[in-house]
Design a protein with these regions (language model features):
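Anion-recognition interface
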Residues: 1
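Alpha-carbonic anhydrase
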Residues: 4-7, 12, 23-271
Length: 271
């Protein structure tokens, strides 16, 4: 699987608007409707909001039937997936150009998100601007069938409407210094709404090992648009038990089940 996946140019302005407005949202401003949450991964429609959830009649199994704008949720290039790549990691031209910027804690209605526009991810010379990062517990992607307690998605968008999402797993261990200031306002959804902006640099979130699984996929929340270049890092980071409990106390089980790989290939690359 050394052939890098080819991505079709996508100009889905609606999908991008939904993603950038809130990659997953039940109301204008809700988060996790997609991996393009810019400022979230949530889907938010100003004129009409279609409720979706992670369980019951509005859960993942029925997303594609809730509204015609969600039909892509039944597509053939959906995310998340189980990550399995046996080949040796290949080098790819990716540049991280993150800068210190103001991050704002945001309650999407489906998860914890931080809206931040602080830098650029360049893939083969193409620029993707950082828009936000948000959390799923437990992880959405799995590795050889194994899940992690949490996963963060850093959502980036290009000028032509394509998304690049960087996924990082978390396991329980030492306290995470980068997340500590953010977690001070995670006592409840009310404290999230009243939180003051924080200065942060997304570069401080990245693990030392830049080996990633990469594949073409979609937003993991409605509208599930298939416009995402996924890069999921192989090395997990840690959170303390207290940090993990604070996160899951507000939102837990906000993960879409893994989707069929179909005819896609998963590459393992070093960034």
């Amino acid at each position: 699987m050394n052939t890098r996946p080819q991505f079709r140019p996508v100009l889905w302005i609606l999908a991008l608007a939904l993603v950038l407005t809130a990659c997953q949202t039940e109301t204008a401003g809700d988060e996790e409707a997609a991996e393009a949450d810019a400022p979230t991964e949530t889907a938010s429609v100003e004129s009409e909001t279609i409720a979706w959830d992670y369980t019951g009649e509005t859960g993942p199994a029925n997303w594609a039937e809730l509204n015609e704008t969600y039909e892509a949720c039944a597509g053939s290039r959906q995310s998340p997936i189980d990550l399995v790549a046996d080949d040796e990691a290949q080098d790819v031209n990716v540049e991280f150009d993150y800068t210190e910027a103001e991050g704002t804690l945001f309650d999407t209605g489906h998860g914890v998100q931080v809206n931040i526009e602080g830098g650029t991810l360049r893939i083969d010379g193409k620029a993707f601007a950082l828009k936000q990062f948000h959390f799923h517990t437990p992880s959405e992607h799995t590795v050889d069938g194994t899940s992690y307690p949490a996963e963060v998605h850093l959502v980036h968008a290009s000028d032509d409407g394509e998304l690049a999402v960087l996924g990082i797993f978390y396991e329980e261990g030492e306290a995470n210094d980068f997340l500590a200031p953010v977690w001070e306002d995670l006592e409840s959804r009310a404290t999230m709404a009243a939180a003051d902006p924080l200065m942060m640099n997304a570069a401080d979130m990245l693990p030392a090992d830049r080996t990633t699984y990469t594949y073409p996929g979609s937003l993991t929340t409605p509208p599930c648009s298939e416009i995402v270049r996924w890069h999921v890092m192989q090395e997990p980071l840690t959170m303390s038990a207290e940090q993990m409990e604070a996160l899951t106390a507000i939102y837990d089980d906000n993960n879409r089940p893994v989707q069929p790989l179909n005819d896609r290939e998963i590459d393992r690359v070093t960034l």
